[in-house]
């Protein structure tokens, strides 16, 4: 049936546009998540003067920007990701980079007008303050430089008993990453 083949081809060629629409919709939805906002403590006058608030008296903590990956290494000891979004599009040094699933992938270390360089979690100098979601035990996630599919959770309490499948999140003690972003699973 010619009509069937035409519809399949038309569908195939529309996938790029459909994907772009879905990315934009996901970004819009992520930017509306309640965890991106914090209520203002009205007892602290300085905070209410400095922070920008919306009509519901809440302040935006995070804002998501979609970015196209234009380069990526994962076989070196110091791996980086390059994205096609820079200072002109709102990106700043030390911003966190996450993947479409919401897991962290690294931190922005260099920004020019239209591109940014991200230090990947697969970088020997990358260290992330982390915790096990189940029992809130804190530790540090690092890469050992060997297997790009495995990160190491170090410096956890000897009393901790991580189990296969446990979720590892960023901890509230991190100076670089917001708390409770997904890192991976044990």
Regions found by a protein language model. Name each.
Residues 1-17, 21-23, 28-38, 42-185:
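A secondary-structure micro-motif
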